[in-house]
Regions:
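Short acidic-hydrophobic surface loop/beta-edge motif
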Residues: 7, 19, 118-125
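Short catalytic-loop micro-motif centered on adjacent basic/acidic residues
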Residues: 28-32, 54-57, 131-133
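Short Gly/Pro-enriched turn/cap motifs at secondary-structure boundaries
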Residues: 7-8, 112, 132-135
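Metallo-beta-lactamase
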Residues: 36, 96, 127-212
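Active-site HxH/HxHxD metal-binding segment of metal-dependent hydrolases
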Residues: 35-121, 209
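A structural micro-motif
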Residues: 2, 50, 78-79, 127-129, ...
Length: 212
């Protein structure tokens, strides 16, 4: 059975998620490891006996990718997945915004797999991960589904109007994301957002994303 563990990043309280199915293997996927110190994540991985195979970034901002460098050092086989725009942006401390939070900031190496180049899908032990571009919060953004879970990064956060004023954000693209998410309703998807609590997509008023 597919399981998802939510772990709060620190010091910024963004969400990291671990996707796993121990009935298949001990491999797992880490989504948005944004902690300066990965202690909480590492404790969970050790407790469950899990080994990260992939890291997926929903977008480039530092509070969603801060832990990537250390993960790559600790787990040498792990592969980073994100959009091509995200891959470019994480290489710049200005574009990933880390320099504005804490001098001197940090930079990441490029992604190992760019979502644009794998036809927006990934077969992971017979679970199909479907990616979609979601460029309201940032042009680098992506949302994706696996099983009954929908990972939205900062494109969709419960009861929060989506922030579009940062670099490459777009109100017009956000409207497209609202339409995309409306079409996903009716499938019993659980939303795993970039901040805050997990919630059910079918029960949520998506107009809150754009302040209606």
């Amino acid at each position: 059975m597919l399981e998802v563990k939510q772990i709060k990043n620190e010091p910024i309280d963004s969400n990291c998620f671990v996707i796993y199915d121990k009935a298949i293997r001990d491999d797992c996927i880490v989504v948005d490891p944004g902690s300066e110190n990965n202690t909480g994540l590492y404790d969970f991985l050790k407790w469950e006996g899990l080994n990260p195979q992939y890291i997926i970034l929903t977008h480039e901002h530092f509070d969603h990718c801060w832990g990537v460098n250390d993960l790559r050092k600790k787990y040498l086989r792990v592969k980073l997945i994100c959009t091509s725009i995200c891959s470019q942006s994480i290489q710049s401390r200005k574009h990933n915004h880390s320099v504005y939070h804490q001098q001197p900031g940090f930079e990441l190496e490029p992604a190992d797999l760019e979502i644009d180049n794998i036809n927006w899908t990934l077969d992971w032990y017979h679970y199909i991960i479907n990616f979609n571009s979601a460029q309201g919060h940032t042009a680098a953004g992506v949302i994706f589904t696996i099983g009954d879970y929908l990972f939205t990064g900062d494109e969709l956060i419960k009861d929060i109007r989506t922030v579009t004023k940062l670099r490459t954000g777009s109100k017009e693209k956000l409207v497209e994301s609202v339409k995309l998410l409306e079409e996903a309703k009716g499938n019993g998807l659980t939303v795993c957002p970039g901040h805050g609590e997990v919630f059910e997509l079918d029960e949520y008023d998506l107009n809150l994303m754009i302040g209606r």
